[in-house]
Amino acid sequence: MSKELLLEIGAEEIPAGFVPKALASLEEMIRKELETARLCFDAIVTMGTPRRLTLHIKGLPVIQPDAELTAMGPSKKAAFDADGKPTKAAEGFARGQGVDVSALQVISTDKGEYLAVTRQETGRPTHELLAEILPRLVAGIPFKKSMRWADLDIRFARPVHWIVALFDGIVVPFSFGPIQSGNISRGHRFMANSTFPVRDFAHYLDECERHFVIVDQERRKETIRKETHRVAKTTGGHLLPDESLLEEVTYLVEYPSAIIGSIPAEFLVVPKEVLITSMRSHQRYFSVVDENGKLLPYFITIPNTLAEDPAVVVRGNERVLRARLSDARFFFDEDRKLRLESRVESLKSVVYQQKLGTSYEKMERFRALAEQLAEQLNPAAKQQAARTAFLCKADLVSGMVGEFPEVQGIMGREYALHDGEETAVANAIAEHYLPTQAGGDLPASDIGAFVSLADKLDTLCGCFGVGLIPTGAADPYALRRATIGMISIILDKGYSLSLSGLIDKSLELLAAKLTRPRDEVRHDVLEFFRGRFVNLQGNAYPADVVEAAMAAGFDDLADCAERIRALDTFRQRDDFQPLTVAFKRVCNIIKEGIDAPVAPALFQDEAEHTLYRVLQETKLSASDKIQQQQYLEALTDIAGLKWAVDAFFDAVMVMAEDSAVRNNRLALLTTINRLFSRIADFGRLAG
């Protein structure tokens, strides 16, 4: 017979960001505890609000199953002396297990024979086990910050006020500090601040809802989503999607509703990004936009109650918002009193990173990189790229960015436009921070792309150059994100450039700052790029295709991506498998190859003449297509070699006794191998 467990930890308001992680930890810990206790179950569900963490487990047995437990001891060799008498190791093991030496068994394992003790353990009542498990569970929930309260020697995110613990409807008795577990829960702090008894999980959910608490976070989230969309439509606009804000607000309320208020028109001169950021960061308000994405003069707030008089709530929120936006308007007006370029000098007093110097030094480095990129890829944009790089960090010392760091770049664009800078430069200032997240928007212009690449590469090479290399999950300088961003930009724009050459230039500019050998840094940065590129391409293509194409070179990322795409497409064709077999036959014969020209005069068989002739024709056509990155067409041409290769192997003995003939045949096969290898190493393909 299986039963259910209900655990509710009731506390003062837990910070919204703590709740999801606490619920995940709660589930992880109980799974481990149940496994250790040999208790199976059907399902685990966790739910949470600002005031409660809830755990529900279905399908627990009433009694722990019996078990045969074996404790392993020392090896037989160490347990007995030459006369077969037990040693101190055997006696100590027996004593530790509470048995006589004569009760010890010898068990054969992969590592040899060892002593062991096997005993039968009778299962204990689950209710009894849970009384031991649950206090560990409550005390073990990790929080980013926890606190003590009163004079208690316990810690939690916020003071705990009640605990519900029921197994099969019966209280599981334990204590957490002065709090005793029971069957009494509590309702909404403001709308139903009273206690109520609980019988089981279904009854608990019903009673919570009757007391204005929606325990299920997914239901609260969906309620907020629907209500915000509904209210936004009443303005003639629609909700600006914001999943992270939705997630946060879900854990700020127990019984959500949605109320709309107005933004005073005087503040609409402030860039919409600032208004949205201010409302989002300080007030947790949702924004409303029209069909073109223009901000409308409304906000949506999610109170934790059903307001008796919504107008009172609106007035209160509008009063607070006016104060917030007045600050933003002040910063906006004050910042525009100084030209953006006049702020650049102030970057000399802003430390970017202790070992890498100031933000001004960083700007000078990546400006030089941006100029090189422009000169190589779009010379007409060189001057604008240099100007963008010079100005793009200047807004970091503005009042607005000091108050709202999220609008860096955006304010640079606004201030540049106000100062009369070229529109292309102003837009590129905002674009150079892109992408801000995986799969996010990329720079639309070459200018923005050049500066973005240069800035990110300086960050990557600089950090690697002074030993700030990501380890495990730790990546304080977001180098993985920066590298993925660079790769995404290069592939999106189709830029053909030498990655190693760009890294060399960056390290040259960083020479005075490096604390590690330049060659080591260069190698590590390239490998870091390789790892990120493999991961990105591996999301879309088979691993062996990616590996095969990269083996032919990945210094030009855009070119490598084209070869991966072509190879994957070609792989779907009927002639792919026979071609791969032919190529592998070539590889198996030549090993390291012969670096010598082919001499037709040494041919002894018509098959050699035929293969050489077909190879010359194929090289001519395929090389031209490879040069134009028409790799699928080039592979089609190369596939035409198969019949001639097969005929060659059928007709001649490659490893002839005559060394000149032998080496000439190897040189012929080496030429074929080099043609294949300009696209991929077919030997790395599976199958």
From Swiss-Prot:
The EC category is ligase
Main location per UniProt? cytoplasm
Keywords attached to this entry:
Aminoacyl-tRNA synthetase, ATP-binding, Cytoplasm, Ligase, Nucleotide-binding, Protein biosynthesis
Recorded GO cellular component terms are: cytosol
Q: Name one GO biological process term.
A: glycyl-tRNA aminoacylation
Similarity section = Belongs to the class-II aminoacyl-tRNA synthetase family.
Protein's name in the database: Glycine--tRNA ligase beta subunit
Organism from which the protein derives: Trichlorobacter lovleyi (strain ATCC BAA-1151 / DSM 17278 / SZ)
